Structures are given as structure tokens and as C-alpha cells.
Swiss-Prot record:
The gene is coaX. Pathway: Cofactor biosynthesis; coenzyme A biosynthesis; CoA from (R)-pantothenate: step 1/5. It catalyses: (R)-pantothenate + ATP = (R)-4'-phosphopantothenate + ADP + H(+). It comes from Rhodococcus opacus (strain B4). Its EC number is 2.7.1.33. GO terms for molecular function: ATP binding; metal ion binding; pantothenate kinase activity. This is Type III pantothenate kinase. K(+) binds at residue 131. The active site is at 111 (proton acceptor). It is found in: Cytoplasm. ATP binds at residues 6-13, 134. Keywords: ATP-binding, Coenzyme A biosynthesis, Cytoplasm, Kinase, Metal-binding, Nucleotide-binding, Potassium, Transferase.
């Protein structure tokens, strides 16, 4: 079994895969809050508790982290508790198979690279990936699987929390779809601005990408939503085609398998 670990600023998502290649299947996933202060021992204790009887069935680990302190602890955890298990940490220098056609490839987040890989693998077409997480990322992937760049905006929670904390008369509200775009009270007005406002933000960015890049003006372009808040925002958008909740975990699986295949090729007596 392959354990995939997706660490973001807000949540950590674990995914457990059986099989490989076309026969791979995500059989279980878990979600927990990210704590940048967690140690390797604490991470191991939580992971083992969630995995239960599957702990001893892990044959590989593929992980990414947008939180540097957690990435360091995951590296220690893997060495200390799963030292016998092959693992891949997606960071600069790791081969993903995704050409990064940007000014500084080292600046591109591992999550954006992995999402791009999975999107190209699933659809084999020009893709625009919208990840609704702590930040809202709109990433552009060519028909060849190249990462062309994108846009980063604040996430839904960050924007909503900032509005409440910086405004004396406003308070934090539950982020749900209001009954109308025209709010009848302060709570509904804030919910409308958050939900419909972010849907409009995404639609606006996607349309601009399609206008600016000739290769993205056709009907073959696939716009994919993923991330924690995708189920809330996607139904209100006009440009998003597909929802892939496990896109990042799928990308982590692909990175692991590609690196394992490369290692196997290097060990081949035919080389």
C-alpha cells in the first residue's frame, strides 16, 4: 500500500492507495488540522493511529508540504519510523515529469506541481486547475503537461477572517451559500460576498487566461476544481467543468511511481 501525505497550511490529508498504475485505487483518506509545531514523534503517533492495521502494510510513502517546519519533521519521521520503506518528498530537485516554464521554477509550490501532473494524467488536454485551499490557486497546464504559471489569490477563509477582524461592525460568519446574492442582513451580505464573490473571481481569471493564451481558447480546455472549499464554490461558477477532490493525492501517487520506475531502471543490468 502507498501512503500519500498532503500537508497544507490549514489541513493535512492522508490517502491510502492499493495497486499501481491503471489498477491503483484510493481506498481510504483522512483529514487533520495542521500544526506547524508538531514533532516527528507526534506525526508518527497520529499517522499510526489513523492507519491502524494498515501501518505494517505500507510499502511506500509520497509526501509534500507547503509548511517547511512540517516537511522537516516528516523527513525525520520517515527515517525514524519507516526507514525501510521507499519514500519520495516532493521538493526542489525531485523529478516530477512536469516542465516548469516560469521565471524561477524553485518558487513553484509542490502542491501546484503535483496538481498539474495529475490534471494532465487524467485529462490529457490543456487544463486550468483551481485549488480552493488556504490560498486560491489558478494554475495553467499545457496540452503537453507543462506548467505555464497561473495566479494566486487569498483563500476564502483568509478573506472572510480578515474582513471580520479589520472591521469593527462585522463579525466572523459561517461560510455557506446564502439564499440570495442580495443579502437581507449582515451575515447574508458577508456570505454573498464570500461565496458569489469568489465564484466571480475564479470565472474572471479563467476567462482572462482563455483570452490571453490562444492554446486555451478552444473547447478542449478542461477547468478542474479541487481543494477543501471546491464543493461550496464550484456550483456557483460558470467556467469550472470538473471536480477532482483527490487530485493532489493522485498526483503524489504518480510522482512516487515515476521515481520508483526510474530507480528500477537504474538498477537494471541492461543499463
Amino acid at each position: 500500500m502507498l501512503l500519500t501525505v498532503d500537508v497544507r497550511n490549514t489541513n493535512i490529508v492522508l490517502g491510502l492507495f492499493t495497486g499501481t498504475g491503471e489498477h491503483s485505487k484510493l481506498v481510504q483518506d483522512w483529514r487533520m488540522r495542521t500544526d506547524a509545531r508538531m514533532t516527528a514523534d507526534e506525526l508518527a503517533l497520529i499517522f499510526r493511529g489513523l492507519l491502524g492495521a494498515h501501518t505494517d502494510q505500507i510499502t511506500g510513502v509520497s509526501a509534500l508540504s507547503t509548511v517547511p517546519s512540517v516537511l522537516r519533521e516528516i523527513r525525520v519521521m520517515l527515517t525514524r519510523y519507516w526507514g525501510h520503506v521507499p519514500h519520495v518528498l516532493v521538493e526542489p530537485g525531485v523529478r516530477t515529469g512536469v516542465p516548469l516554464l516560469v521565471d524561477n521554477p524553485k518558487e513553484v509550490g509542490a502542491d501546484r506541481i503535483v496538481n498539474s501532473l495529475a490534471a494532465h494524467h487524467l485529462y490529457d488536454a490543456p487544463c486550468i486547475v483551481v485549488d480552493f485551499g488556504t490560498s486560491t490557486c489558478v494554475d495553467v497546464v499545457s496540452a503537453k503537461g507543462e506548467f505555464l504559471g497561473g495566479a494566486i489569490a487569498p483563500g476564502l477563509e483568509i478573506s472572510s477572517d480578515a474582513l471580520a477582524s479589520q472591521s469593527a461592525a462585522l463579525r466572523k460568519v459561517e461560510l455557506v451559500r446564502p439564499r440570495s446574492v442580495v443579502g437581507k442582513n449582515t451575515v447574508e451580505c458577508m456570505q454573498s460576498g464570500a461565496v458569489f464573490g469568489f465564484a466571480g473571481l475564479v470565472d474572471g481569471l479563467v476567462r482572462r487566461v482563455r483570452r490571453e493564451l490562444p492554446a486555451f481558447s478552444g473547447s478542449d480546455v478542461v477547468v478542474i476544481a479541487t481543494g477543501d472549499r471546491a464543493p461550496l464554490i464550484m456550483p456557483e461558477t460558470e467556467t469550472v467543468d470538473e471536480h477532482e477532490p483527490d487530485l493532489t493525492l493522485e498526483g503524489l501517487r504518480l510522482v512516487y511511481e515515476r521515481n520508483q520506475a526510474r530507480r528500477g531502471a537504474r538498477r537494471s543490468p541492461l543499463d
